[in-house]
A protein has these predicted regions:
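Conserved beta-ketoacyl condensing-enzyme motif
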Residues: 24-114, 118-137, 207-217, 289-290, ...
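Condensing-enzyme catalytic core mediating Claisen C-C bond formation in acyl metabolism
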Residues: 1-26, 148, 228-293, 297, ...
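Flexible glycine-/small-residue-enriched beta->alpha junction loops
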Residues: 113-171
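N-terminal extracellular/periplasmic Venus flytrap/periplasmic-binding protein-like
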Residues: 14, 24-25, 29-34, 45, ...
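Short, well-ordered amphipathic alpha-helical segments that serve as non-catalytic structural scaffolds
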Residues: 28-44, 69-73, 98, 165-172, ...
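Conserved catalytic cysteine-centered active-site region
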Residues: 26, 58-114, 146-147, 160-164, ...
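Active-site pocket-lining segment
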Residues: 56, 167-170, 279-349
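Active-site-proximal alpha-helical scaffold in enzymes
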Residues: 90-120, 173-202, 258-265, 331, ...
Length: 395
């Protein structure tokens, strides 16, 4: 059996909304359906019934995104009922995992046309109450927020593994001696690059606003922020001597993204030129408390699989969960030219809707490669509980 080439024909995303912001009244299954429908509408020559499967990442899945949000999106988007859908969860890497699983299906001949993406509504993530082990327990019961982080943790897990995500970022800052000023400068650059990219219209080809919502661009970008403004923010996780703040970490967000993946036959049916080709991917594990450094080995492994090196990269979308985490990874890739990293801004400015982010990054790289005409691109994320995920694209 020969392995087929896998092409990205198109990629779309919503503007990313802030927690409690413009998209907070929109259900996650409706967000997912919106990008699926937009993707299909942008390839009118392709019969929607030809979509062999829809893969969607979703990190929480405890609320309106329960019971296979991918399948719900298919139905809500008006695709034929014959089109199936599957939801995958690799936490922050869920959207990229969906892209990788769709690519694998096409590569081995199980599919010719697939949609892959991700969704998250952190605003609408519910509170949950753990079911007691016996009826009528005495005392108070605890509600858990499903928006972010550890909950109902297994007591067998070592305490050092289950630290808060922000404390994990502080551990990376400790490991690489990253100052507050370095982290704030990285965050400022993220906002500046994102604002400039929007001003130049660089996101016009991939962002599809949600109808009826007054949101045309990413909601968390702060055009006028400064080092002075960022310096006024208090540490969020270590009151004494901490360096991680709300200003140098990604916010809580709502959004969705989707990509159209095809083989050669599917490409002919669309009648379109592909944005990029999927070349390789890799996933690795690391100590859970150092999750922020998860991309370090995943990126090296993905590049090795692709037969490429850091010098070959023309663009690199690295998810900015925290400035400390991103800077820690960059410190472990001395061969990498930092100028190719997040040229249009990153998650600190754009936002990090957990299950959608990996698909957003993959789509961003594909669009950047298409704009350049040729090159090698990379997308990577750190993942809570200690993993890293990376994807190599080429054009």
């Amino acid at each position: 059996m020969s392995i087929r080439d896998v092409y990205i024909v198109d990629a779309v995303r919503t503007p990313i909304g802030k927690f409690g912001g413009a998209l907070s009244a929109v259900r996650p299954d409706d967000l997912a359906a919106h990008v699926v429908r937009a993707l299909v509408d942008r390839s009118p020559a392709l019969d929607p019934a030809r979509v062999d499967d829809v893969f969607f990442g979703d990190a929480n899945g405890a609320g309106e995104d329960n019971r296979d949000v991918a399948r719900m999106a298919v139905l809500l988007a008006g695709l034929p009922v014959s089109v199936p859908g599957v939801t995958v969860n690799r936490l922050c890497g869920s959207g990229m995992e969906a892209v990788i699983q769709a690519a694998r299906a096409i590569a081995v001949g199980d599919a010719s046309v697939a949609i892959a993406g991700g969704v998250e509504s952190m605003s609408r993530a519910p509170w949950v109450l753990q079911k007691p082990e016996r009826a009528f327990p005495a005392g108070h019961q605890q509600l858990h927020s499903t928006t972010l982080g550890w909950r109902m943790t297994n007591p067998r897990m070592p305490a050092e593994w289950t630290v808060a995500l922000g404390e994990g970022a502080e551990l990376v800052a400790d490991k690489h001696a990253l100052s507050r000023e370095q982290q704030d400068a990285f965050a400022l650059a993220s906002h500046q690059k994102a604002a400039e990219a929007w001003a130049k219209g660089l996101y016009d080809g991939e962002v599809v606003p949600y109808g009826g919502v007054d949101l045309a661009r990413d909601e968390c970008i702060r055009d006028s922020t400064s080092m002075e403004a960022l310096a006024k923010l208090k540490p969020s996780f270590r009151p004494d001597g901490g360096t991680v703040t709300a200003g140098n970490a990604s916010p809580l967000n709502d959004g969705a993204a989707a990509l159209l993946l095809v083989d050669e036959a599917g490409l002919r049916e669309t009648g379109r030129e592909p944005l990029a080709r999927i070349r390789a991917s890799a996933v690795t594990g690391i100590e859970p408390q150092l999750f922020g450094l998860g991309p370090v080995q995943a990126v090296r492994r993905a590049l090795d699989k692709a037969g490429r090196g850091f010098a070959d990269l023309t663009t690199f979308e690295l998810n900015e969960a925290f400035a400390a985490q991103s800077l820690g990874c960059l410190a472990e890739w001395p061969e990498l030219d930092p100028a190719v990293v997040n040229p249009r801004g990153g998650a600190i400015a754009i936002g990090h809707p957990l299950g959608a982010s990996g698909a957003r990054l993959a789509g961003a790289v594909a669009h950047q490669l298409a704009a350049a005409g040729s090159g090698t691109g990379l997308a990577a994320l750190c993942i809570g509980v200690g993993q890293g995920l990376a994807l190599v694209l080429e054009r």
